[in-house]
Amino acid sequence: MKRFFLAYICLLLCVSGNLPAQSLEKNIEQRLTDYFINYQTSYANIGTCKLDHFTVDHEHKTLQVYANDNFGYQPFTEENTQAIYRSLKQLLPGPVNYYRITLYADGQPIENLIPNFLRKKGKDKERLYGKIEYKGDAWTQNISKPFKISQGLQDRHIAVWQSHGKFYKNDRNEWRWQRPRLFGTTEDLYTQSIVVPYLIPMLENAGAVVFTPRERDWQKNEVIVDNNTCTPGSRYFEKNYKKNVWKTTSQPGFAQKYLRYPDNYNPFRDGTARFISTLSKPEKAFAEWIPNIPETGKYTVYVSYQTLPQSVSDAKYLVFHKGGVTEFKVNQQMGGGTWVYLGTFEFDKGVNDYGMVVLSNESSQKGVVCADAVRFGGGMGNIIRGGNVSGVPRYLEGARYWGQWAGMPYEVYSKSQGENDYNDDINARSLMTNYLSGGSVFNPTEKGLKVPFELTFAMHSDAGFKTDDALVGSLGIYTTNFNDGKVNSGISRYASRDLTDMVLTGLQKDISSRFGIQWARRSMWNRNYSETRLPAVPSMILETLSHQNFADLKLGYEPEFKFTVARSVYKSILKYLAEMHHSNYTVQPLPVSHFAVTEEKKKNTFELRWIPTEDPLEPTAKAQGYVVYTRIGYGGFDNGTYVKGTSFTVKAEPGLVYSFKVTAVNKGGESFPSEILSAYKAKRSKGTVLIVNAFHRTSGPESMNNLMMQGFDIQSDPGLPYISTTAFCGYQQNFNRTKAGIETEDGLGYSGNELEGMQIAGNTFDYPFVHGKAIQTAGRYSFVSCSSETVESGSTDLSPYYMVDIIYGAENSTLSNRMQQALTNYCRGGGKLFISGSYIGNKLGD
């Protein structure tokens, strides 16, 4: 009995000894549960956070806390990470609040989720390129630019694409968009209206070589010039030099045997290519591609060649166009057997001496240059699926079909072997980049064309709607759970999270600052998406905004919003790659303002003047010089003249109309251009007319938003795009706001297809030329022009001019008080005033 009693006492003591520990862990669990349920952050909309589990080690005095996925959706900085740990220590009971606490989210301690660019110390070298660096010549270089870039994206190769595109739906035997027609657009069209006219030019202005797996040219015409077959009226020509003669390579090359192509047919296997040994002497032997251009306009120029064992890295191409001759160096040691983009140029209709491409055998290296087909213009879709082609311009199609036309292997553009075009198109964007980059320093484990792409960026828009006119905002996606957590160069896939964080942080800051709102930042998802899983390099998807939400698109249709988004993304990519390579960066300047062209006292000269634009968000984005581009008559713009200061004097030949635009440049690259101003000196001038361009407005389409109706009345007013846009699919048909979220004809925003493939004209910023040509035709009067900004600031005096011509265009606001006063004073002094515009009758002011 005594033994039994002693055993009972011992058992009781043991149980009572465990009670405090059990009670403590329950206490910890309850406090952590409450903390995460009530957790809120102003940084992002991340949904509901929860405690997943925790482990406590009293012996080693450690506490490991694991939060759910949502907690990892937010951005982490050194400041908010320290604040989170302070909060945990304050809420936890003793003695655990003195333990070493580690909080995990997204599979990492949260301090590891602080992007490298925000760390003052302790950089994660596993997600930096470090010594991994491409040191050769870029794939393509425009060497006619009158300035050099040293702290931009020079020699960087980036793959960028704009979401989806029209595709063949196998199970329904029809061509269709990948996303629904809503609010006058589709995702397939909308994101393209940011990527093509804004983002890609900004990256290229910073010096980057940009590849996009969808056709970038909105030109519906296409001309092929080749040594095998040519578009009718076009011509391929070769000139030999002594013993240096053009020969046929042993590899197959491009030939256009058909107008339409079935699946799994490669036009880059149907023809031949030519090669010749190089010489250091200039232009002794060359090949010429002379197109028969069907219609005057802008055309992209793509070249092609084969990469041969003796290929040189400085093949010299000359593009003759309406503005003159632009010279390129192409590294033929990479990227053979596909279309290689050089640039977009203006060409006159027909066959012209100033419309051709020339490849010289001049090189600083001993080897060979290779010549295959040259392509002018984007063209129409020509891939047959289900017995038919798409019937739309190629730029509207998905990447799968451009990949076939660009000579990609079948397994690259059709992983499903022709069974599922939808999946193939999604995969092709990444697989094309991998194929092009295979064998490069950034993708050494795959075979390919050795182009050193080091980043991919996919711009999408998302679904989702709000019924209270609130914003849905931006979401970022990356993938780490693939290939043992590494990209093909061996660095951590968490480098993609850094990129995603930088882009979302930049967007929230830039959009909020520019538009005076709080732009909605959503989550950062670490999920298994093809476009972030398959790329061999760091990659991200940006769901820019919701194409299903009126408030997002009302802002999203504004050209200024598109510019802001593109500039923000460009800046983030610039800073990200500078961090990855431990290099300095400079942000390219904003466009100049207060542009004016006046007559100089010296005979037959014009003075150009302007002022730089400060960027309050970017201290490095200061202009260090300028480039003045000149156009004569109906020609194109030349390659530009570098100017150090903010004025430039031009000698003019009487009888010719001169047009000018100015860009600002610095170590980081080149800004977007100014408005275009024109000037003319009559041979026997009776006086000078001043043309004042007051038409600077751009806007989205007309909108309506009341208790019952919501949407965009594109038919009434499509808005004023920057230059032009292809963003619209058709007119909105359903405006019933109670039907939000329905993606059929019964749903809010449902739209037609009347505008698909159309380029809607916008503000070209080139109207002084139009008015000036009329003045020239009238005879005996010269003219100069200026921005209305210079009249309002007082830097342009109206009194010396015989007449003032105010271009008010589609401006729908009242003339400013300063402008009204200047015009009043001019008229009171006997001046002659002509003013034109769409809203002049009710917008002149008091």
Regions found by a protein language model. Name each.
Residues 66-68, 73-176, 357, 371-388, ...:
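Non-catalytic propeptide/linker segments at domain boundaries
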Residues 797-799, 806-846:
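A glycine-rich, often tryptophan-bearing local segment used as a flexible ligand/cofactor-contacting loop or short
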Residues 576-620, 654, 668-687:
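Pro/Thr/Ser/Gly-rich low-complexity, intrinsically disordered linker/stalk tracts
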Residues 161, 396-493, 525-548:
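Active-site microenvironments of hydrolase-like enzyme catalytic domains
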Residues 272, 373-381, 461-483, 514-583:
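Active-site-adjacent mobile loop/cap segments within catalytic or ligand-binding domains
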Residues 649-670:
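Beta-strand-rich modules
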Residues 357-368:
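Short beta-strand-plus-loop segments that form exposed binding edges in beta-rich domains
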Residues 194, 198-206, 214, 386, ...:
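Aromatic-Pro/Gly-enriched surface loop or interdomain linker
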